[in-house]
From Swiss-Prot:
Localization terms from the record: Cell membrane; Endoplasmic reticulum membrane; Golgi apparatus membrane; Nucleus membrane
Enzyme Commission number(s): 2.7.10.1
Modified residues (Phosphoserine): 229, 697, 993, 997, 1028, 1041, 1044, 1070-1071, 1166
UniProt name for this protein: Epidermal growth factor receptor
Highest taxon in the source lineage: Eukaryota
Cytoplasmic side: 671-1210
Disruption phenotype: Mice are growth retarded and die at different stages of development depending on their genetic background. Embryonic death is due to placental defects. Mice surviving until birth or later display brain, bone, heart and various epithelial development defects in several organs, including skin, lung and gastrointestinal tract.
Length: 1210
């Protein structure tokens, strides 16, 4: 009988686990890993060889596993041995077809790529559909820290089937970035035996092994099956073969031979016999996630028992008993620095203001030190400023000088050379004039202050011309010299009798060997005893604090655990075992602060002790596993079952009572406030006087409509992106009571978002609800759930920046100039509405169709008041490289600062998505702008286009063009695009169909996106009439847009009647006046029904267009046809399809009143933009009340854009 697929999978898991457990006893081969990220090491061949040398036969990677720049024909079979990675795994920029990480079990994530990702698979593709296709990580079952990122892997198979929730910890799931492309035709399908269709590749062996999401509720982490008895030990990672800590496939923390442990066996154990910490013969060092008896070669041991490659700060490396260890430095760690005349100071005369910082933390000077008068005067020739005397304190760390010390200048108000108070030795290997190793000449000091100087190995000493210097003659210099022929020249200093007259003599506590100054710490040696570096008369043996004992004429402090005795000695020597009486407790011969509690002892047992009435520590009973308070078993019960449980119960009851009291107090407070408000409201309603406005602004009221949606009215389909504010979803809006689906983008704040973030998203909703323009993204609605959600129109082509980067080889001059016109129109509309955008960039322009773009992202936009001309920002993150200079320096934002950002946006388009000021830090932008530097002229731009950009970047904001002027300039250029933009092969370029866009495919590849209605179409009234003039927000037209282009105008809307939505705007969107239409577009594709004027459309055969509302118009001309751009001087009459030659065939009887059809020359429209009031409504009427058609010569009135819907009909 053949075993089932599930049985075979289980058997395979068991065999793998047994092999891993058996192999755990063997020492695994480790390798360091790399941290090169995306850096290429030499040629492709050199890079690959470096990779092969690093990971050949490697099983554990201590650092990061980075597989980059591997070409198609290279063999990566040496990666099969890798089982564990301590850092992150980066697989990027490869064209090799298969990367066999078949035995990789765990990624620990001790270091993360971009501080977020433990596994990053990025841009693994080449030309001609080559690249990474297979990544069989069939044994990867655990990522301890970090998330996963996939991006730009167009032919990588099966990754979309993996259940990452089983591998990644739940806390990191929100950081996942999964840009996966599915290729069912070319990729192998998962084996039918794979659980839930999850696999790493074709075949049963590549099925994903689930060890977390299938576990029973009783399991804390991993399991080997669905039963509660299949739970793994909590020390296990990536699964197990049994319930014990020795049955783990991989250890979560440390592996000690075949057992998983929380920590490695300690190096020291408590000995209850000697009352000391003894060396543990079973102790081990931690090396990565493994416990080892000794650290590998070239590693050093820390105090905590870890193997590291280098000691930390304040530690130095030393060898003891054949083991390299890290020892804590006594003071600053040794640091050798070059002296004057060596290395970087080769041509330097003296320590000065520019080089003094190089001596910071130096303990040894290799060479000489000179301090000359030029240091304090400065040097105008070399532009060296005077030295600040306080900076000489840097030299206090210097203990050794291998050459000589020359001091010919010193601060006048300093009385000694205390900057060198820690100098211990002057070796004199080089000498001034070949003679002197210490020279102090012409200073105003009273003492030398070299209190730590113990040796001058070679060279003479000269101390001369210091008119106030005393004490120098008291020093026994011969005792400091290293050779008998060394001499001193101490002359022309202050006379000895003058020094005695002013009491500049050695302290009485100094011995006859002399002193360096007047203080007791300046003595060369002490007359009596010393405490540290200072001479004292006597030690604190019987009185005083702290208590001391005498050793070699030095006062040594007693151990802190010794109890001070009244008029008696406190201790007899060093350590806690020489105390006369203990301050706290006594454990054997030692004084201790507390009795041992839970200290690791022999045989991995914890040692517990209690103190008796005499504060002597005694061992607890062997069965007392949590400590004791007395002898025997009865002492064990005091802590666990005595006061502990009642105290816990008391704490719980007390906490509950406190919560109840607080709740009652809050309730009473809210009740009281409600009553006060109610009374205040009643009193106000009874007032007869009305409050008169004191400062009317005269500004028109904002009558924008804000739609409040229920959460049941829309459905989230997939995540489009996430950030600090929250998450953006693709979804469908299904209005209540209507059978339509509208694709939308849903912007949702994170849980527990701050009140500031809530305010910011509501401010953004206010701005978006206040706008209504074809080239500005508008708000469809807002949902006020616990996390505020904004619902906007979905743009399936993504942002304009990504769009031009993806299609840069197919974008012609016409499209670029049209986009410039449309963005300028949108910004001009915002300026008319007194809105400052503050974040205009190509990334914040969305593509509705290739001919229609919209401005979005109003997160930084501000609405100016009636009297405001500019906005002053307070702080926050801002796009420096797109901002005007006044915005960077003074945080001033105006409509003219938006013009600057517009210029940068145009530059992004003309360079097909290049980064502005690439390689220049944002902190340097303001300085280079002030110096006159600007973005370079794009290669495709003529000087006409570039001069417009330059005008946008003028320092004087008033000198920049207005958006109205920019519309005129770019509209003129769009009528003759190849004159202003020079693109090779421009006449043959055309944008691909929507489905060729990667973003479009990823966005629309959902079965829920069928039979949808575009938001613009839903909001624009369908063919028919309003119920009454009172409900209409626009004047009634004789004809509206038809629902089909192959029928006469019909009065049919979605609900089968002639009524339209009351909240819809008539003539909401207009086609771009500069959009390009070819004869082929007109003859062979669907021509959209005019929305603004009554234009006729010739009937077409019934089968030519299945659903004209969703049909996409071709974007490229037919071969052999000349492309006709809109030109106001062309003869548009020659094409009768653009003229109003037909009358509506359906008129409701409710509109027979002539008054409803009488139009005046000045139309009062409720549209937001006065430009559209002027340009898109006829100003003349026929006697019969029907509007006249637009002037054929004016391209602004022609409907030449493709359909507004970007969705293809089913």
């Amino acid at each position: 009988m053949r075993p089932s697929g599930t049985a075979r999978t289980t058997l395979l898991v068991l065999l793998t686990a047994l092999c891993a457990a058996g192999g755990a006893l063997e020492e695994k081969k480790v390798c360091q890993g790399t941290s090169n990220r995306l850096t290429q090491l030499g040629t492709f061949e050199d890079h690959f060889l470096s990779l092969q040398r690093m990971y050949n036969n490697c099983e554990v990677v201590l650092g990061n596993l980075e597989i980059t720049y591997v070409q198609r024909n290279y063999d990566l079979s040496f990666l099969k041995t890798i089982q564990e990675v301590a850092g992150y795994v980066l697989i990027a920029l490869n064209t090799v077809e298969r990367i066999p990480l078949e035995n990789l079990q765990i990624i620990r994530g001790n270091a993360l790529y971009e501080n977020t990702y433990a596994l990053a698979i990025l841009s693994n593709y080449g030309t001609n559909r080559t690249g990474l296709r297979e990544l069989p990580m069939r044994n990867l079952q655990e990522i301890l820290i970090g998330a996963v990122r996939f991006s730009n892997n167009p032919i990588l198979c099966n990754m979309d089937t993996i259940q990452w929730r089983d591998i990644v910890q739940n806390v990191f799931m929100s950081n996942m970035s999964m840009d996966l492309q599915s290729h069912p035709s070319s990729c192998p399908k998962c084996d039918p035996s794979c659980p839930n269709g999850s696999c790493w590749g074709g075949g049963e062996e590549n099925c994903q092994k689930l060890t977390k999401i299938i576990c029973a509720q009783q399991c804390s982490h991993r399991c080997r099956g669905r039963s509660p008895s299949d739970c793994c030990h909590n020390q296990c990672a990536a699964g197990c073969t049994g319930p014990r800590e020795s049955d783990c496939l991989v250890c979560q923390k440390f592996q000690d031979e075949a057992t998983c442990k929380d920590t490695c066996p300690p190096l020291m154990l408590y000995n209850p016999t000697t009352y000391q910490m003894d060396v543990n013969p079973e102790g081990k060092y931690s090396f990565g996630a493994t416990c080892v008896k000794k650290c590998p070669r070239n590693y050093v041991v820390t105090d905590h028992g870890s193997c590291v490659r280098a000691c930390g700060p304040d530690y130095y490396e030393v060898e003891e008993d054949g083991i390299r260890k890290c020892k804590k430095c006594d003071g600053p760690c040794r640091k050798v620095c070059n002296g004057i005349g060596i290395g970087e100071f080769k041509d330097t005369l003296s320590i000065n203001a520019t080089n003094i910082k190089h001596f910071k933390y130096c303990t040894a000077i290799s060479g000489d030190l000179h301090i000359l008068p030029v240091a304090f005067k400065g040097d105008s020739f070399t532009r060296t400023p005077p030295l600040d005397p306080r900076e000489l304190e840097i030299l206090k760390t210097v203990k050794e000088i291998t050459g000589f010390l020359l001091i010919q200048a010193w601060p006048d108000n300093w009385t000694d050379l205390h900057a060198f108070e820690n100098l211990e030795i002057i070796r004199g290997r080089t000498k001034q004039h070949g003679q002197f190793s210490l020279a102090v000449v012409g200073l105003n000091i009273t003492s030398l202050g070299l209190r730590s100087l113990k040796e001058i190995s070679d060279g003479d000493v000269i101390i001369s011309g210091n008119r106030n210097l005393c004490y120098a003659n008291t020093i026994n210099w011969k005792k400091l010299f290293g050779t008998p022929n060394q001499k001193t020249k101490i002359m022309n200093n202050r006379a000895e009798k003058d020094c005695k007259a002013v009491n500049h003599v050695c302290n009485p506590l100094c011995s006859s060997e002399g002193c360096w100054g007047p203080e007791p710490r300046d003595c060369v040696s002490c007359q009596n005893v010393s405490r540290g570096r200072e001479c004292v008369e006597k030690c604190n043996i019987l009185e005083g604090e702290p208590r001391e004992f005498v050793e070699n004429s030095e006062c040594i402090q007693c151990h802190p655990e010794c109890l001070p005795q009244a008029m008696n000695i406190t201790c007899t020597g060093r350590g806690p075992d020489n105390c006369i009486q203990c301050a706290h407790y006594i454990d054997g011969p030692h004084c201790v602060k507390t009795c041992p509690a839970g200290i690791m002892g022999e045989n991995n047992t914890l040692v517990w002790k209690y103190a008796d009435a005499n504060n002597v520590c005694h061992l607890c009973h062997a069965n007392c596993t949590y400590g004791c308070a007395g002898p025997g078993l009865q002492g064990c019960e005091v802590w666990p079952s005595g006061p502990k449980i009642p105290s816990i119960a008391t704490g719980i009851v007390g906490g509950l009572l406190f919560i109840v009291v607080v709740a009652l107090g809050i309730g009473l407070f809210m009740r009281r406030r409600h009553i006060v408000r109610k009374r205040t409201l009643r009193r106000l309603l009874q007032e007869r006087e009305l409050v008169e406005p004191l400062t009317p602004s005269g500004e028109a009221p904002n009558q924008a409509h804000l739609r409040i949606l229920k959460e049941t009215e829309f459905k989230k389909i997939k995540v489009l992106g996430s950030g600090a504010f929250g998450t953006v979803y693709k979804g469908l809006w299904i209005p209540e009571g209507e059978k339509v689906k509208i694709p939308v983008a849903i912007k949702e704040l994170r849980e527990a978002t701050s009140p500031k973030a809530n305010k910011e998203i509501l401010d953004e909703a206010y701005v978006m609800a206040s706008v209504d323009n074809p080239h500005v993204c508008r708000l469809l609605g807002i949902c006020l759930t616990s996390t505020v959600q904004l619902i906007t129109q979905l743009m399936p082509y993504g942002c304009l920046l990504d769009y031009v980067r993806e299609h840069k080889d197919n974008i012609g001059s016409q499209y670029l100039l049209n986009w410039c016109v449309q963005i300028a129109k949108g910004m001009n509309y915002l300026e008319d509405r007194r809105l400052v955008h503050r974040d205009l960039a190509a990334r914040n322009v969305l593509v509705k169709t290739p001919q229609h773009v919209k401005i979005t992202d109003f997160g930084l936009a501000k609405l100016l008041g009636a009297e405001e001309k500019e906005y002053h920002a307070e702080g926050g993150k801002v796009p420096i490289k797109w901002m005007a200079l006044e915005s960077i320096l003074h945080r001033i934002y105006t409509h003219q600062s938006d013009v600057w950002s517009y210029g940068v946006t145009v530059w992004e388009l003309m360079t097909f998505g290049s980064k502005p000021y690439d390689g220049i830090p944002a902190s340097d932008i303001s300085s280079i702008l002030e110096k006159g530097e600007r973005l370079p002229q794009p290669p495709i731009c003529t000087i006409d286009v570039y001069m417009i950009m330059v005008k946008c970047w003028m320092i004087d904001a008033d000198s920049r063009p207005k958006f109205r002027e920019l519309i005129l300039e770019f509209s003129k250029m769009a009528r003759d695009p190849q004159r202003y933009l020079v693109i090779q092969g421009d006449e043959r370029m055309h944008l691909p169909s929507p489905t060729d866009s990667n973003f479009y495919r990823a966005l629309m590849d959902e079965e829920d996106m069928e039979d949808v209605v575009d938001a613009d179409e839903y909001l624009i009234p369908q063919q028919g009439f309003f119920n009454s003039p009172s409900t209409s927000r626009t004047p009634l037209l004789s004809s509206l847009s038809a629902t089909s282009n192959n029928s006469t105008v019909a009065c049919i809307n979605r609900n089968g009647s002639c009524r339209v939505k009351e909240d819809a705007f008539l003539q909401r969107y207009s086609s771009d006046p500069t959009g390009a239409v070819t004869e082929d577009n007109i003859d062979d594709a669907f021509l959209p029904v005019p929305e603004y004027v009554n234009q006729s459309v010739p009937k077409r055969p019934a089968g030519s267009v299945q659903n004209p509302v969703y049909h996409n118009q071709p974007l490229h001309p037919a071969p052999g046809r000349d492309l006709h751009y809109q030109n106001p001087h062309s003869n548009a009459v020659g094409n009768p399809e653009y003229l109003n030659t037909a009358q509506p065939t359906c008129l409701s009887s409710g509109f027979n009143s002539p008054a409803l059809w009488i139009q005046k020359g000045s139309h009062q429209m409720s549209l937001d933009n006065p430009d559209y009031q002027q340009d898109f409504f006829p100003k003349e009427t026929k006697p019969n009340g029907i509007f006249k058609g637009p002037t054929a010569e004016n391209a602004e009135y022609l409907r030449v854009a493709p359909p507004s819907s970007e969705f293809i009909g089913a």
